Amino acid sequence: MKLRHLLLGAGLGICTAVVVRQYVMKPYISSEKALRIVKSAFKQRGPIDGSWIYTQPEPYNINGETVQVYKTGITRSAFGELEQYEVMVDAKTGEIVDVIDTIAS
């Protein structure tokens, strides 16, 4: 009986440690989550025609500070005109740090 309890406790401890380690060691949000954040923000101002994201974080300089960001893009139509935006999302916090209006071709 005691060996069984010991093995059960050890197994439970190892499983818990693995789950906690994966949660703590993950420094960035997923690129999918970053894109959902951007799409949610833009959907508040109207429908979206298309979106994209670079799945690897890259350095971006904002206000003299370099942060790791996911670069995303949104395309939509407004008043018959095509609008395109590049959006930088902080890879650690998910905060939108910059929006650049690009010229649609």
Swiss-Prot record:
Pfam families (UniProt xref): PepSY (PF03413)
Q: Which domain of life is it from?
A: Bacteria
Question: Per its record, how is this protein called by name?
Answer: Uncharacterized protein YtzB
Supply the source organism for this entry.
Answer: Bacillus subtilis (strain 168)
The gene for this chain is ytzB
